[in-house]
Design a protein with these regions (language model features):
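Short helices/loops that flank or line small-molecule/ion binding pockets
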Residues: 72-73, 81-82, 86-100, 113-115, ...
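Extended ligand-binding regions for polar small-molecule ligands
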Residues: 22, 64-73, 139, 144-145, ...
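Flexible hinge/capping segments at coil-to-helix
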Residues: 30-32, 129-146
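A ligand-binding cleft/hinge motif common to bilobed small-molecule-binding domains
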Residues: 104-112, 157-162, 182-186, 190-219
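Periplasmic-binding protein-like
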Residues: 45, 122-129, 196, 200-242, ...
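Extracytoplasmic small-molecule ligand-binding "clamshell" domains
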Residues: 25-103, 247
Length: 268
């Protein structure tokens, strides 16, 4: 009798353990966003034209407009949360934000840590120099001082060309690209390595006298980063992005910021 009771208790405990494991492993990431009626987007608010503050201090940009459209269709409120870009993965994994969405380059290293949507835009890492500069190639920058944003994909691009990196006199990290460009303008550094999309927008809209060297260091793609376990939330955002692309709304948003559709969702 005692043996039967013991067996029954052990079976009951096993069932509880199995059901408990099942619940803890359940992906309710999308449901959590629905329940709190808020999608928290982590971004660098000094990264035009993807996400930045306008003259009134309001956060605007291509990614911001796209995220607003996604949230409108998902019927949840959007919260824009500026973060330290150099600590973006920590901000995400701590639960402070639901995603990283701000000209976020998909790299192999990041894919090992995060879950990404499919790419929605292509970009290049390029070198920026002052207008009238005699620098035309990477070779011309031998022994010179290069600036880049800390924690950005520019650092990955630089590491991918070790010969060029080793030829430089110094590499200086900045909190953001705009600070690096200001230091370039003052003569503190000789070149800035950054996203071409950001550089060309800045040159055009801020009327700054910089030039982009034709020789790129790397080509890349932008995606939206989520926690590895948040598959359901990522899929919901991906589905919505595809719908926005299909009905032409994404083209309108892209044309507003870039003068044409440079997105790649649905492109063959």
């Amino acid at each position: 009798m005692k043996k039967n009771i013991l067996t029954f208790l052990l079976l009951g405990m096993a069932v509880l353990l199995i059901s408990g494991c099942g619940e803890s492993g359940k992906d309710n990431s999308w449901q959590k966003v629905k329940d709190k009626n808020q999608f928290v987007l982590g971004l660098d608010d000094s990264f035009p034209p993807m996400g930045f503050r306008d003259e009134n201090g309001k956060i605007v940009g291509f990614d911001v407009d796209l995220a607003k459209e996604v949230c409108t269709r998902l019927q949840v409120k959007l919260k824009l949360q500026p973060i330290n870009w150099d600590a973006k993965e920590q901000e995400l994994n701590s639960g402070k934000i639901d995603c990283i969405w701000n000209g976020f380059t998909i790299t192999e290293e990041r894919q090992n840590k995060l879950l990404f949507t499919k790419p929605y835009m292509k970009n290049r890492q390029v070198l920026i120099v002052t207008a009238g500069s005699t620098y035309r190639t990477q070779t011309d920058l031998k022994g010179k001082k290069l600036g880049l944003q800390a924690g950005s994909s520019a650092a990955d691009a630089l590491n991918s060309v070790p010969d060029f990196k080793d030829s430089l006199g110094d590499v200086v990290e900045f909190d953001d690209n705009m600070t690096a460009l200001m230091d370039l303008e003052k003569g503190g550094i000789d070149t800035v390595l950054m996203d071409e999309i950001v550089a060309r927008y800045y040159i055009k809209n801020k009327h700054k006298k910089y030039q982009v060297l034709e020789q790129e260091l790397a080509s890349e793609e932008y995606g939206i980063g989520f926690r590895k376990k948040d598959q359901k939330l990522m899929e919901k955002v991906q589905e919505t992005l595809e719908a926005i692309s299909k009905d032409g709304k994404m083209k309108k948003i892209s044309t507003k910021w870039f003068g044409e559709d440079i997105t790649v969702i649905g492109a063959k």
